[in-house]
């Protein structure tokens, strides 16, 4: 809670879901802070009574037998006590991130949580950590276990951010994505643990964002993306529908969107004149969170087998693509993405070089970063992974040695595909 400043909000911070982070309360005459929706007030972690309540609640769940916790925006629980104005970057509001991410007491609070709750149970913990750097990640997910087991970082998801933050139609450049991967894999080596993900409930579909979801390339592109994920070092996460290659929904009207972030952003950017309605809709088609929130596609029956209710009763519309992938089709086809993901998991489990202790080294194949290549190794086992996200075939040039079947040290990688080789 904060008092008004000159009769207005305490500062100029903009909320992640649009508008100000401050909501005025008539009863108290004060403002309360909400970094996201006004229905999600930020807890005051500086108050020891609040921390007691949180830890008691967590203990209650642990005693019920939960396996762990995924902690939402946990890097934002400690704020700069001065609450200064932020730089106006989107033309509308001040940027709060320097003052709410990785704040002065965040590690103190997490260590207290660990001592009082987490260390007393057999749990897995992952912290969603907006604004985290590799240096901060070494504290959140350090291998001494004093805070969390691993983090969800967003740097690879932010490679397209520009003038209006996430709202863009640009696709990620592999060169930038590769640089982010290289940094996180190398910087955390032997010091902290990372999660691996492309998809989740807050991100558009991976094959639409990082690959090619056209009918010609959707399946091979999704396999390429899956191979890259499962061959990296860290704990891989698979989001529902990712294993069958679900794509962005590409809704054509703002009325089809349900996410508060998308609706508020559309309203703010179009009413302010920063974007036209068409421009903003194109941004939503590319990066809206609703792309990941359409119903799971089980089969070709009504509502893709998700529900027998009328389509108008669903929370959100189905992907309108009539040729959309379904679990039934994917499970029936032996060479499908679904079976490829299962194979990748088996391969990862059966090769030490691909497991937690396996070292990773990125290889520069070409100046434009196509294809992306890296080596995983443990003991005398070495595995070269090559990822080609380009729309055409590319040659990977590497001194494979006599053990590899490659002519003059070259392997040609087809468009939108991946391969891995013992070397």
Language-model features: where?
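Active-site and adjacent substrate-binding regions of carbohydrate-active enzymes
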Residues: 1-423
């Amino acid at each position: 809670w904060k008092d008004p400043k000159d009769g207005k909000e305490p500062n100029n911070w903009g909320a992640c879901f649009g508008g100000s982070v401050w909501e005025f309360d008539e009863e108290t005459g004060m403002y309360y802070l909400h970094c996201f929706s006004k229905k999600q007030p930020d807890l005051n972690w500086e108050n020891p009574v609040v921390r007691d309540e949180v830890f008691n609640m967590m203990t209650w769940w642990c005693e019920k037998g939960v396996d762990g916790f995924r902690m939402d925006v946990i890097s934002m629980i400690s704020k700069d006590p001065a609450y200064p104005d932020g730089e106006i970057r989107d033309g509308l509001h001040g940027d709060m991130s320097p003052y709410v991410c990785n704040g002065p007491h965040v590690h103190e609070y997490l260590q207290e949580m660990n001592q009082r709750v987490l260390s007393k149970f057999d749990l897995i913990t992952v912290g969603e950590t907006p604004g985290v750097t590799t240096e901060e990640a070494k504290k959140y997910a350090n291998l001494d276990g004093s805070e969390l087991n691993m983090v969800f970082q967003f740097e690879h998801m932010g490679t397209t951010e520009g003038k209006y933050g996430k709202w863009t139609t640009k696709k990620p450049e592999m060169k930038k994505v590769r640089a982010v991967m290289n940094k996180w894999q190398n910087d955390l080596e032997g010091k902290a643990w990372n999660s691996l993900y492309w998809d989740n409930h807050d991100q558009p579909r991976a094959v639409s964002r990082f690959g090619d979801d056209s009918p010609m390339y959707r399946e091979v592109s999704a396999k390429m993306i899956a191979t890259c994920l499962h061959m990296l070092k860290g704990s891989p996460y698979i989001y529902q529908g990712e294993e069958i290659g679900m794509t962005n929904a590409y809704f054509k009207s703002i009325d089809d969107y349900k996410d508060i972030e998308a609706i508020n952003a559309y309203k703010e950017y179009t009413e302010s004149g920063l974007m036209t309605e068409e421009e903003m809709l194109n941004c939503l088609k590319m990066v809206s969170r609703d792309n990941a929130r359409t119903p799971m596609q089980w089969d070709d029956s009504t509502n893709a087998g998700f529900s027998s209710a009328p389509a108008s009763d669903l929370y959100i519309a189905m992907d309108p693509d009539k040729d959309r992938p379904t679990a039934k089709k994917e499970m029936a086809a032996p060479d499908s993405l679904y079976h490829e993901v299962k194979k990748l998991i088996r391969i990862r489990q059966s090769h030490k070089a691909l497991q937690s202790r396996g070292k990773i080294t990125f290889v520069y194949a070409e100046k434009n970063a196509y294809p992306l290549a890296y080596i995983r190794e443990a003991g005398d086992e070495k595995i070269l992974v090559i990822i080609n996200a380009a729309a055409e075939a590319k040659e990977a040039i590497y001194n494979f040695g006599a053990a590899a079947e490659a002519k003059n040290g070259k392997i040609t990688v087809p468009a939108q595909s991946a391969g891995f080789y013992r070397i």
